[in-house]
């Protein structure tokens, strides 16, 4: 039959018009060219590919004769090329979809129809359909920062008083007793509102920057390392730099309101008074030592967190990137905060001293090295670690709660596949070797 069709095709070239040929219930993979007579348009490489196309008068009119009978299994030949190059048959399935099951095609068709009816485009494969990672990570970081700082606000107040020596008491119990006698329990939360306003966006920017930098710096598959040092260190440093640069004025105002309660009535009054009396540049006084203190702390904090989490997975036999649970996250985050705080505390002391400035007749420091030198000269090495105990007591739960809240919010707001992919990306080379 295929040979007969080929002969028929060549004979009809001498006809006035190919369209005058009427063959009932037959569809051909070629057509008249541009409406001209005596010419046919054949798909390239398909001149002799009609064998196996099942072109015969017995093919039902409702089905494309180029499509194979599902009951007949045949080997692939040039007919597939002809069918893919030929114009589509009305009502037939598009090329490339013929090998899929009918149920899958119907489901996909319904999905396309629903998307078209709703006026939206289909998401590409691998993309989340209902979750946006960037806003979700920002919200998760903000919630984590607000919750963690509110829980440890009293410890933050006590730590700040001990670091700057504003009330002449050298113990946590003494500072707590003095605050309760002179200010009441509200004194423990003095400056907490501005602290939350500062920490919430700071943590949002910090965690978002860290996740973005870690994902960018982590090699994919068998790629060589992009940087010669651990990725969490660099990503953490970038996160600390970005968050500090954006939120430093709020940090300075919070410190002033906490220490100089007789000078400033509230946050707004402190902001206006600083701008009026000292100028806008005063809002960034101590930025350099702040960056020197915060950037190493963030780098150490994230690196310690990733390292401890990887060691915990290995000790408990969990796969790389697996969830470690809220309790383990709280403990690991607390330990990471203690390690980072101990390593960078002298820089934190110098930063606080420079932020206070000349208020209350205190000494003005030219730079962070000058501050450290003066503290060493006046108080010795112990002066650089004044308040380390309460600092760790405050930072340990703060870091643990922040990491726990952030991971919990990510599970709710961020696509699970995207979260697991980034978790595995931060697992380190040891996890990759273990999987292999």
Curated annotation (Swiss-Prot):
<keyword id="KW-0677">Repeat</keyword>
<dbReference type="InterPro" id="IPR002067">
    <property type="entry name" value="Mit_carrier"/>
</dbReference>
<keyword id="KW-0035">Amyloplast</keyword>
<feature type="repeat" description="Solcar 2">
    <location>
        <begin position="227"/>
        <end position="311"/>
    </location>
</feature>
<dbReference type="GO" id="GO:0090480">
    <property type="term" value="P:purine nucleotide-sugar transmembrane transport"/>
</dbReference>
<keyword id="KW-0813">Transport</keyword>
<dbReference type="GO" id="GO:0005743">
    <property type="term" value="C:mitochondrial inner membrane"/>
</dbReference>
<keyword id="KW-0150">Chloroplast</keyword>
<keyword id="KW-0812">Transmembrane</keyword>
<keyword id="KW-0472">Membrane</keyword>
<keyword id="KW-0999">Mitochondrion inner membrane</keyword>
<feature type="region of interest" description="Disordered">
    <location>
        <begin position="83"/>
        <end position="135"/>
    </location>
</feature>
<keyword id="KW-1001">Plastid inner membrane</keyword>
<feature type="transmembrane region" description="Helical; Name=2">
    <location>
        <begin position="193"/>
        <end position="213"/>
    </location>
</feature>
<dbReference type="InterPro" id="IPR023395">
    <property type="entry name" value="Mt_carrier_dom_sf"/>
</dbReference>
<keyword id="KW-1133">Transmembrane helix</keyword>
<feature type="transmembrane region" description="Helical; Name=1">
    <location>
        <begin position="137"/>
        <end position="158"/>
    </location>
</feature>
<feature type="transmembrane region" description="Helical; Name=5">
    <location>
        <begin position="327"/>
        <end position="347"/>
    </location>
</feature>
<feature type="transmembrane region" description="Helical; Name=3">
    <location>
        <begin position="229"/>
        <end position="247"/>
    </location>
</feature>
<feature type="repeat" description="Solcar 1">
    <location>
        <begin position="132"/>
        <end position="216"/>
    </location>
</feature>
<dbReference type="InterPro" id="IPR018108">
    <property type="entry name" value="Mitochondrial_sb/sol_carrier"/>
</dbReference>
<dbReference type="Pfam" id="PF00153">
    <property type="entry name" value="Mito_carr"/>
</dbReference>
<dbReference type="GO" id="GO:0009706">
    <property type="term" value="C:chloroplast inner membrane"/>
</dbReference>
<keyword id="KW-0809">Transit peptide</keyword>
<feature type="transmembrane region" description="Helical; Name=6">
    <location>
        <begin position="384"/>
        <end position="405"/>
    </location>
</feature>
<feature type="transmembrane region" description="Helical; Name=4">
    <location>
        <begin position="290"/>
        <end position="310"/>
    </location>
</feature>
<keyword id="KW-0934">Plastid</keyword>
<dbReference type="GO" id="GO:0033098">
    <property type="term" value="C:amyloplast inner membrane"/>
</dbReference>
<feature type="region of interest" description="Disordered">
    <location>
        <begin position="417"/>
        <end position="436"/>
    </location>
</feature>
<keyword id="KW-0496">Mitochondrion</keyword>
<dbReference type="GO" id="GO:0015866">
    <property type="term" value="P:ADP transport"/>
</dbReference>
<protein>
    <recommendedName>
        <fullName>Adenine nucleotide transporter BT1, chloroplastic/amyloplastic/mitochondrial</fullName>
    </recommendedName>
</protein>
<comment type="function">
    <text>Probable adenylate translocator that mediates transport of ADP-glucose into endosperm storage plastids during starch synthesis. Transports cytosolic ADP-glucose to amyloplast stroma by counter-exchange with ADP.</text>
</comment>
<feature type="compositionally biased region" description="Acidic residues">
    <location>
        <begin position="417"/>
        <end position="428"/>
    </location>
</feature>
<feature type="repeat" description="Solcar 3">
    <location>
        <begin position="324"/>
        <end position="412"/>
    </location>
</feature>
<comment type="similarity">
    <text>Belongs to the mitochondrial carrier (TC 2.A.29) family.</text>
</comment>
